[in-house]
């Protein structure tokens, strides 16, 4: 019998050092042809463009796997504290180009595909976006994964592998129509299924209290199948893992119910279990209390926590025996970050495992849970806060309900001891909201069960402390932090705007790509004629390229010398796309009134998806398209004003439009946008911002100087004062003739001649119940837009402001954000250690 291998011998066998790298062009070509032949089983006679994309994707993926295995081996050996980022959304976009960029493979692949008679850009366009997110929250998670890998943190993203991501948006007769996003139809070359790590997740059932502890019995079981996707850091040979769970019915599903005589019926019903990971809920900043959604939230939490504990218990590489049985050190080895309240069930689930399964006593378990978990709040809108009916929990997760009651009881006892007799405070701070329908406030559960709570921009974190969680802040002020959001400069500069990246590298080197604060060095070039020329030239090239794409995709001709005024984000009343509409109508009316006057030509682009059930958001889209129909076909206007609705806005479209934008619209009512990250992307890519003092705009103005942004409108204090006084929209309507004219045109059917009453709901809302006070900021907004026009007439001064903005955008790198999370919440240090290449 062969002698058992030592640890190091076994590692050498598993190690992938022997596989040759693909760095050079000949290697890439060889690998490409090999995959076309052996993986896709095609030759050049029958291969489709999609086959070529897959051959290239597999070629690039080959380059990842050695580093991926290496990284995981490295973590096994060092056994560092691991970071678990739990999110129901990861809005990843496309992977091919990002992987080539982070591995430094782009040049080789470009040359190899050229030699093969193929166009790299055309192949990149074939890839589907991984649209497993709605907007900012999911995209933030994706940027964070990129930064965690680049900073060498032992981090894992955990979420759901939705079969259908965010819907594809079609515009039909000016209305949004949703289509299913079947992004996996052709297969996903980046993921690796891991059936060997499949785990059971339990639902329903009943609870039994026995002398030996608590049992959760007679549950329905669904299996969670993990799919792993590599997350490469930027040129540091680190490749982390994003693990997404897919729901599978167990083999005996419904067949163990002896009364089911119908085998076929039982097999068909497997779909019911597997529906858990079928589709992403398309709500942004809105809570819809559906049982399937609660199942999704528990599904990801239950599977992930089992996985975390399995990894905690297994010690070094190759050893599958549980070694650590004491949970004392759990918070020293594990940090769990909750991306909003969606994974809040991590708190009661970890308690259930520690108390019921691992037999840790309650107080010890609670201490471990609190030290492990941290919670990020993403919104202050009351309609977005998760409040689940107790009755739903009773049925679906009976043991978790008991645990939540116990957590709440101890919490309220603690509060009562500190504030005797303050009954209203107890009501306000309870996890359970009393009323017709008792509800569980998930945000309160998160605050109580975490050692750190953070907002995502300074102003938002202040609102969190002074309003949303005021009572909790008074109880434990040391818990509350700010972590201003950021974006990855790899995707949002190097990948999407190579022209700009190149002229920056020529001046200051490439250190800024991993230390964005180095962009400050560009301040010395604000008056450098050559640099001003280069920046303007790159912008113009980006605009020409995007104009060509618009013409190809949407059959719309636009003037590439016009100002590109861009407003892209989810469609929501608080983001105030309606304020933009009023400006467009006002500009239109001014051109019509005085057609001989010279106007700065503008192309206004508005894009974003509306939640399918959000009536007002869908009406806003219809209004934009209707205004476009009138403006774009008016011969008096010509190409001085164009209104384009960008259909199906998504990550891959953002990568095209943002580098081409001149003006970035960030015009939410002050106090409503937690941070925003689109604002940062535009700033980094050389657009100027028109915006309110809200979210991260405040810090952008602080970094670049308020005079280098177009800031207008009410501040948070003004909004509060107006609330106190009572907002009266009619007052503004009566006082401002241009506003009145615009509103009257909307209500009279000027923009909807075939259906004059089309927009009566919109006008009624604006006039009588507008929570977001569009009219109150109208006058300031119009004046501010006039200043934009004025500066745009002087291209050199405009470009100087652009350079100042780019130079001051360094703070808004997600590398900075993640470094702060690491040091101040997770208790780990970023590492610039290069894992040796395979």
From Swiss-Prot:
User: Which reaction is catalysed here?
Assistant: [(1->4)-alpha-D-glucosyl](n) + phosphate = [(1->4)-alpha-D-glucosyl](n-1) + alpha-D-glucose 1-phosphate
- The protein's site described by May be involved in allosteric control is found at 156
Positions binding pyridoxal 5'-phosphate in this chain are 569
State whether keyword Kinase applies. Answer: no
Segments of this protein annotated with the region Pyridoxal 5'-phosphate:
677-678
The cross-references to InterPro entries, in alphabetical order and at most eight, read: Glycg_phsphrylas (IPR011833), Glyco_trans_35 (IPR000811), Pyridoxal_P_attach_site (IPR035090)
Q: What is its EC number?
A: 2.4.1.1
Q: Which GO terms describe its cellular component?
A: axon; cytoplasm
**Positions carrying Phosphoserine:** 15, 524
Q: Which residues carry this modification: Phosphotyrosine?
A: 197, 473
Q: Which domain of life is it from?
A: Eukaryota
Q: Which GO terms describe its biological process?
A: glycogen catabolic process; glycogen metabolic process
Chain positions with N-acetylalanine modification = 2
Q: Residues where N6-(pyridoxal phosphate)lysine occurs?
A: 681
| Similarity annotation | Belongs to the glycogen phosphorylase family.
Quaternary assembly: Homodimer. Dimers associate into a tetramer to form the enzymatically active phosphorylase A.
Its annotated function is as follows: Glycogen phosphorylase that regulates glycogen mobilization. Phosphorylase is an important allosteric enzyme in carbohydrate metabolism. Enzymes from different sources differ in their regulatory mechanisms and in their natural substrates. However, all known phosphorylases share catalytic and structural properties.
Tell me the protein's name. Glycogen phosphorylase, brain form
Q: Which organism is it from?
A: Rattus norvegicus (Rat)
């Amino acid at each position: 019998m062969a002698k058992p291998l030592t640890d190091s011998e076994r590692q050498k066998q598993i190690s992938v050092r022997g596989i040759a790298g693909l760095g050079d062009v000949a290697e890439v070509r060889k690998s490409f042809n090999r995959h076309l032949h052996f993986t896709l089983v095609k030759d050049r006679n029958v291969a489709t463009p999609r086959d070529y994309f897959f051959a290239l994707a597999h070629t690039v993926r080959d380059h990842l796997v050695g580093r991926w295995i290496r990284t995981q081996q490295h973590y096994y050996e060092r056994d560092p504290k691991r970071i678990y980022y739990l999110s129901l959304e990861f809005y990843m976009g496309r992977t091919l180009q990002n992987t080539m960029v982070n591995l430094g493979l782009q040049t080789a692949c470009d040359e190899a595909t050229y030699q093969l008679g193929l166009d790299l850009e055309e192949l990149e366009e074939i890839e589907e976006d991984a649209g497993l997110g709605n907007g900012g929250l999911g995209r933030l998670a994706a940027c964070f994964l990129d930064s965690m890998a680049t900073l060498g943190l032992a981090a894992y993203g955990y979420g759901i592998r939705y079969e259908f991501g965010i819907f594809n948006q079609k515009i039909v007769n000016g209305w949004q129509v949703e289509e299913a996003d079947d992004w996996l139809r052709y297969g996903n070359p980046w993921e690796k299924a891991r059936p060997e790590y499949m785990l059971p997740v339990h639902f329903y059932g009943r609870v039994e209290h026995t002398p030996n502890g608590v049992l959760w019995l007679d549950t329905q079981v669904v299996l969670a199948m993990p799919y792993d996707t590599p997350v490469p850091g930027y040129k540091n040979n680190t490749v982390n893992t994003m693990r997404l769970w897919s729901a599978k019915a167990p083999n005996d599903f419904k067949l163990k119910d002896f009364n089911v005589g119908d085998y076929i019926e039982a097999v068909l019903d497997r779909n019911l279990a597997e529906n858990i990971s079928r589709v992403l809920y398309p709500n942004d900043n809105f809570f819809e209390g559906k049982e399937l959604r609660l199942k999704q939230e528990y599904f990801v939490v239950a599977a992930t926590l089992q996985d975390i504990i399995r990894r905690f218990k297994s010690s070094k590489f190759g050893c599958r025996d549980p070694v650590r049985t004491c949970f004392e050190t759990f918070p020293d080895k594990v940090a769990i970050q909750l991306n909003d309240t969606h994974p809040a069930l991590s708190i009661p689930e970890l308690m259930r495992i520690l108390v019921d399964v691992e037999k840790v006593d309650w107080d010890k378990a609670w201490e471990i849970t609190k030290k492990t978990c941290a919670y990020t709040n993403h919104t202050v809108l009351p309609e977005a806060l998760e409040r689940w009916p107790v009755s739903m929990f009773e049925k679906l997760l009976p043991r978790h309900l008991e645990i939540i009651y116990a957590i709440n009881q101890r919490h309220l006892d603690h509060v009562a001891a500190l504030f005797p007799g303050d009954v209203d405070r107890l009501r306000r701070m309870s996890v359970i909201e009393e009323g017709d329908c008792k509800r569980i406030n998930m945000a309160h559960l998160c605050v109580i069960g975490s050692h750190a709570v953070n907002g995502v921009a300074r102003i938002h974190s202040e609102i969190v402390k002074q309003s949303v969680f005021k009572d909790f802040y008074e109880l434990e002020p040391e818990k509350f932090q700010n972590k201003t959001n950021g974006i990855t400069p790899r995707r949002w500069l190097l990948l999407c705007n190579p022209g700009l990246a190149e002229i920056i590298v020529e001046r200051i080197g490439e250190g800024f790509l991993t230390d964005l604060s180095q962009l400050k060095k560009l301040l010395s070039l604000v008056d450098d004629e050559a640099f001003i020329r280069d920046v303007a030239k790159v912008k113009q090239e980006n605009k020409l390229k995007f104009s060509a794409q618009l013409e190809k995709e949407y059959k719309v001709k636009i003037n590439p010398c016009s100002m590109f005024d861009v407003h892209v984000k989810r469609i929501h009343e608080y983001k105030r796309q309606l304020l933009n509409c009023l400006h467009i109508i006002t500009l239109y009316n001014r051109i019509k009134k005085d057609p001989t006057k010279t106007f700065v030509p503008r192309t206004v682009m508005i894009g974003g998806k509306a939640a399918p059930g959000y009536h007002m958001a869908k009406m806003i889209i219809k209004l934009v398209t209707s205004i476009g129909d009138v403006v774009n076909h008016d011969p008096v206007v010509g190409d001085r004003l164009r209104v384009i609705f960008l259909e199906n806005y998504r990550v891959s479209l953002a990568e095209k439009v943002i580098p081409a934008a001149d003006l970035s619209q960030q015009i939410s009512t002050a106090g409503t946008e937690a941070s925003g990250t689109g604002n940062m992307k535009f700033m980094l890519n050389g657009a100027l911002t028109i915006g309110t003092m809200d979210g991260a705009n405040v810090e952008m103005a602080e970094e670049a100087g308020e005079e280098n942004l177009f800031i207008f409108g009410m501040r948070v204090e003004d909004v509060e004062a107006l609330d106190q006084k009572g907002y009266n929209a009619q007052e503004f309507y009566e006082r401002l003739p241009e506003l009145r004219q615009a509103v009257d045109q909307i209500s009279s059917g000027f923009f909807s001649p075939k259906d004059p009453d089309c927009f009566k709901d919109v006008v009624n809302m604006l006039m009588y119940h507008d929570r977001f006070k569009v009219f109150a900021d109208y006058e300031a907004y119009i004046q501010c837009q006039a200043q934009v026009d004025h500066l745009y007439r002087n291209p050199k001064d405009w470009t100087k402001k652009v350079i100042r903005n780019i130079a001051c955008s360094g703070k808004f790198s997600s590398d900075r954000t993640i470094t702060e999370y690491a040091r101040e919440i997770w208790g780990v240090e970023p590492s610039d250690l290069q894992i040796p290449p395979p």
